[in-house]
């Protein structure tokens, strides 16, 4: 069964076409700079990689070009071969505690959550509608970043603000990276052969968050109402005193929205180092002895260690610490700096194994009291797996209904 995993941004569209349940990637496609006459389409199969520059005014055109390209390149012979499409949606609010089949009702519910994710949900919705127009009969599913964290208890997701803010405006912690956490959790349960494993996962890419997992469920996570909360990231500040927003607004003669934009886009690595938001640039500058680069990295590592220590206490000990996503999977320096600061817990790094990049590996010594792993995440596969699961559920329900009808009519 061919299933498509879609991840859309305001000016980008990324997807994979997978053969399921074999988990085979047929093609990966990335559309960048949508909305311009210099949009870039990159298509990668097992055998080759093609790149084109095209005029693409909107997502609808992008989707049509993408699907036409699949046929022209003979990746598929007809659109009907695509039996399912899974769309990454950033915010599911409290409405969705699982991925959902896309219907008029569920799409309207997703649209109602745009206030909670004004930068992301509208772009997700545009992409969904574009695919529905081109593939109107195809089974389509929304897979939310937030659903994995809906298992958090109120004491962990509520803020100590006026309670009516939550009742009236749904102000609470929602978290992010849930699809990644779900995938990594399932991988770790298999590795440890333990369904009730207690795990702390560090998802470190340009966006960075942590999650405490107990028996396959999220107990707490570092990102909050938006992805701005938590640890410093590539361009995000992470936690700060909220009063800073008003203070800087007055001192710099900026609107609150502009200050929040600075916290989202001009802070973190970029803000402190003054160099870049890219970890590779920061690490290169650290090697050269750049003190601001060192400081930006140290601040991030310190805050990550704070969360790990807090979650260790919350879970009353852990079976494993896991690093995933771009930085977590590929930076041995990043991992070693964190693990060294956790030595008080008895965790011991195997320096040789820690050299691994982008591959699954146990990176602690045999006598380490806590196991630490590198586990590559695969959000596209996780999305496809959810589409397959919901499609099979629908098929099984149809068969059950038919059987009941047969028995009743007979």
Curated annotation (Swiss-Prot):
Q: What is this protein called?
A: Acetate kinase
Gene (UniProt)? ackA
| InterPro entries documented for this protein | Ac/propionate_kinase, Aliphatic_acid_kin_short-chain, Aliphatic_acid_kinase_CS, ATPase_NBD
Reaction(s) catalysed by this chain, per the record, are:
acetate + ATP = acetyl phosphate + ADP
List locations, semicolon-separated. Cytoplasm
The record, for PANTHER family, names:
ACETATE KINASE (PTHR21060), ACETATE KINASE-RELATED (PTHR21060:SF15)
Biological processes per GO annotation? acetate metabolic process; acetyl-CoA biosynthetic process
Q: Any idea which UniProt keywords this protein has?
A: ATP-binding, Cytoplasm, Kinase, Magnesium, Metal-binding, Nucleotide-binding, Transferase
Describe, as the record does, how this protein assembles with itself and its partners. Homodimer.
Query: Which residues hold ATP?
Result: 14, 203-207, 278-280, 326-330
Question: Which note does the record give on the cofactor?
Answer: Mg(2+). Can also accept Mn(2+).
SUPFAM superfamilies (alphabetical):
Actin-like ATPase domain
Q: Which family, according to the similarity comment? A: Belongs to the acetokinase family.
Which PROSITE patterns does the record match to this protein? ACETATE_KINASE_1, ACETATE_KINASE_2
Residues under site feature: Transition state stabilizer: 177, 236
- Pathway info: Metabolic intermediate biosynthesis; acetyl-CoA biosynthesis; acetyl-CoA from acetate: step 1/2
> What function does this protein fulfil?
Catalyzes the formation of acetyl phosphate from acetate and ATP. Can also catalyze the reverse reaction.
Which cofactors are named for this entry?
A: Mg(2+); Mn(2+)
Q: Which residues take part in binding substrate?
A: 88
- List, in alphabetical order, the Gene Ontology terms for molecular function in this entry: acetate kinase activity; ATP binding; magnesium ion binding
Work out whether the entry's keyword set contains Transferase. yes
């Amino acid at each position: 069964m061919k299933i498509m995993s879609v991840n859309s941004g305001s000016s980008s569209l990324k997807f994979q076409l997978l053969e399921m349940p074999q988990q085979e990637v047929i093609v990966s496609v990335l559309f960048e700079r949508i909305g311009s006459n210099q949009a870039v389409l990159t298509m990668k199969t097992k055998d080759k990689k093609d790149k084109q520059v095209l005029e693409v005014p909107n997502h609808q055109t992008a989707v049509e070009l993408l699907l036409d390209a699949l046929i022209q390149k003979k990746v598929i012979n007809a659109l009907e071969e695509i039996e399912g499409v899974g769309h990454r949606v950033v915010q599911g609010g409290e409405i969705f505690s699982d991925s959902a089949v896309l219907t008029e009702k569920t799409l309207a519910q997703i649209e109602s959550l745009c206030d909670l994710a004004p930068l992301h949900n509208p772009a997700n919705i545009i992409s969904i509608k574009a695919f529905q127009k081109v593939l109107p009969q195809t089974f389509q599913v929304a897979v939310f970043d937030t659903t994995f964290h809906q298992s958090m208890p109120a004491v962990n997701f509520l803020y100590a603000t006026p309670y009516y803010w939550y009742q009236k405006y749904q102000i609470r912690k929602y978290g992010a990276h849930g699809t990644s956490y779900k995938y990594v959790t399932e991988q770790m349960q298999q590795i440890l052969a333990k369904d009730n494993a207690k795990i702390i996962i560090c998802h470190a890419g340009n966006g960075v968050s942590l999650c405490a997992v107990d028996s396959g469920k999220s107990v707490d996570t570092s990102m909050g109402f938006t992805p701005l909360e938590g640890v410093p990231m590539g361009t995000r500040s992470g936690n700060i005193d909220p009063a800073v927003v008003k203070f800087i607004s007055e001192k710099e003669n900026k609107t609150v929205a502009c200050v929040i934009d600075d916290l989202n886009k001009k802070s973190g690595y970029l803000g402190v180092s003054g160099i870049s938001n890219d970890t590779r640039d920061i690490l290169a500058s650290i090697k050269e002895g750049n003190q601001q680069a060192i400081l930006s990295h140290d601040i991030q590592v310190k805050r990550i260690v704070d969360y790990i220590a807090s979650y260790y206490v919350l879970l009353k000990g852990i079976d494993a610490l896991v690093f995933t996503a771009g930085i977590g999977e590929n930076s041995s320096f990043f991992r070693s700096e964190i693990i060294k600061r956790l030595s008080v817990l008895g965790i011991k790094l195997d320096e040789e194994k820690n050299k691994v990049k982008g591959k699954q590996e146990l990176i602690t010594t045999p006598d380490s009291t806590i196991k630490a792993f590198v586990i590559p995440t695969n959000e596209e596969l996780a999305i496809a797996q959810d589409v397959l699961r919901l499609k099979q559920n629908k098929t099984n329900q149809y068969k059950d209904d038919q059987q009941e009808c047969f028995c009743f009519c007979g």
